[in-house]
Amino acid sequence: MKNMSQRSMDVEKKAANADSCSVSTSSINVDDADVALRFLKQNGLDESSTANEDDVVAGEEANFYGSHELSPKVLRKVDLFILPFLCCTYLLMFLDKALLNYAASMGIKDHLKGNEFSNLGTIFSAAYIFMEPVVTYLIQKFPISKILGTFITVWGIVLACHAACKTYASLMVVRTLLGLFESSSAVGCIAISGMYYTKSEQSARIGFWATQAGTGYIVGGLISFGFLHYHGTAFTSWQIMFLVVGLVTVAFGVLTFLYLPDNVTNAWFLNKEEKIQVVEHIRANQTGLETKKFKKQQVKELFLHDKFTWPMLLLTACSQISTGAIGTFSVTITGTFGFDKYETALLQLPIGAITAMIILITTQMLSRWGHITLITTSMYIPAIIGCIVLISLPLSHKIGNLFSLYLLYSGSCVITNIYIWNSCNTSGYTKRVFRNAITMIVYNVSCIIAPQMFRAYSAPRYIPAKIALLVTQCVCVPLQLYIGYICKKENEKRDKEQEGQERKKYQFLDLTDIENRNFRYIY
C-alpha cells in the first residue's frame, strides 16, 4: 500500500506539470517525456498552445477515433510510406517461418525420424522466446528502423543458409538462428503502428499488415508448388526454395534499414507542418509516440499491478495453441486425408484466402464500430465446430475434414485482435513494448507446445492433439468475455472519478494507462 501511495504521488507530480491551463511544457522534464513532447517544444509549441481537442470529441469516442482530424492527404502519405514496410515485414516473417511447413511435402522429412520434424518447429519458437526480451530492449533504446532492418537482413541470410543443410543437426542450428532474428518482427510492427495512427486507425492498419499471414499461405503454397517441379541433382527443391526466399528477405532488410523512419518526428516523407498534424492526431490515444529512456517501474507495473496482464496472457496461450498446431502440421494433416503432395500444396492456397478474409473483415469491423470483445468471441465458434468435426469424422471423408481444418483458422486469427488490444489499451512506451514482448513469448510457448501434441504414435488421426485444440478454444470464450467486462468496469470507474472535473493534459508525459486516469480502454 505504501508503494502504491508513493506511485500515486509521483503521478500527481507529473500531472500537475501537465495542466495545460497553468503550466507550459517548459516546466516538464522532457527527458522523461515522450519524443512527441520534445518535438513540439523544439517547434515552439506546447500543451497550452494547442486546441482543447477533448472539447471537440469527448470520452471514449475521442479515445477511439481521435479528436483532431487528420488531412486525408497526410493520412494517405503515411499509409503509402509506412504500410508497405509493415506488410512486407509481416509477410516475410510469416512466409520464412512457414517454409518448413511447405518443405514437409517437398522431401525435407525424408531423412528425419520420429519427432525430429516437430523439434524443428519447437526450437524456432524456443529461440524466439529467448531473444524477445533482448530485442524489445534494443527497440526501446535504439532507432527502431535500424534494429528491424538489421534483424530482417540477418534472418534472410540464415534462411538462405537452409539450402546448405543436409543433416538434422544443421537444420536445428539454422532454425535456432532464424527464431532469434525473427523475434523483432511482430513487436516492431505493433510499435510502429501505434506511432502514426489513432486507435480506430490502428485496428484497420494492423488488420492490413496482419492479413499478410494469409498472403503468406498463398505465396508459400504457390512457391512450394512451383519448386516441386524442380528436379536438380545438386540441390533438392526445398533447398532452392529456401535460398530464393532468403535472398529476397535480405534485399528487403536493406531497404528497411535505409528508408523506414524511426518515428513521426523524423519521417522523411512529411514536412514540419504535416508532422505536427500527425502528432496532434494521435494525441487522443493517450499513448504518445516513443521514448528511449527505459523505465523499469513500467515493467514492474505490467507484471505486478496491471489486472489485464495475466488474463490476456492466458487468452493468448489458449487461443494460439491452434496456430502452433496448424502452422507446423497443416500440410501433414491435409496429407492424412488422402491427398497427394501436389494436391496438398495447392490446398494450402484456400487457407491463405480464408485467413486474409477473416482478418480483414474483423479488423475493419473493429475500426468502424469497436466492440472488440464481441467480435473476438465470435471468432472462436467456427474453430470449436471445426475441432468437433475433425475428432468425429473418419479420415475417408476428405472434404468434410478439409473444411473443418479450414475452420480452425478462425481461432488462430485472434492473434491480430490481441495485437490491436495491446496497442490500443497500453500506455507508457516501456510498458507497451514489453507487453508486446511477453505476448509474443507466450505466443511462441504455445507454438512449442502445440507441435509436441502431434506425437508419432497417434498418427494419422492425432486424436489427442485435436481434443487439446477443442478444449483450449472453448476456454477462450469465457476468458475473452471476462477481459471485456473488466475493461468496461474500469472505464466506468474512471468516468465516475472525473465527474465534474476538468481533464488535465497527460498525453505526452509517457504515463502508463494506470497512471493516466484520462486513459480509456477499448472493449
Swiss-Prot record:
Protein location: Endoplasmic reticulum membrane; Cell membrane
GO terms of molecular function: transmembrane transporter activity
Pfam families attached to this UniProt entry: MFS_1
Parts of the chain that traverse the membrane: 80-100, 119-139, 142-162, 177-197, 208-228, 240-260, 313-333, 346-366, 372-392, 401-421, 433-452, 467-487
Signal sequence region: none
Chief location: endoplasmic reticulum
Membrane topology, Cytoplasmic segments: 1-79, 140-141, 198-207, 261-312, 367-371, 422-432, 488-523
Cystine crosslinks: none
GO cellular component, one term: plasma membrane
Factors inducing expression: Induced by limited extracellular thiamine levels.
A biological-process GO annotation: transmembrane transport
Membrane topology (Extracellular): 101-118, 163-176, 229-239, 334-345, 393-400, 453-466
SUPFAM superfamilies: MFS general substrate transporter
Alphabetical UniProt keywords: Cell membrane, Endoplasmic reticulum, Membrane, Transmembrane, Transmembrane helix, Transport
Membrane topology: Multi-pass membrane protein
Annotated function: Transports either thiamine or, rather, a related metabolite involved in the thiamine biosynthesis pathway.
Family: Belongs to the major facilitator superfamily. Allantoate permease family.
PANTHER family reported for this sequence: PERMEASE-RELATED, THIAMINE PATHWAY TRANSPORTER THI73
The protein's name: Thiamine pathway transporter THI73
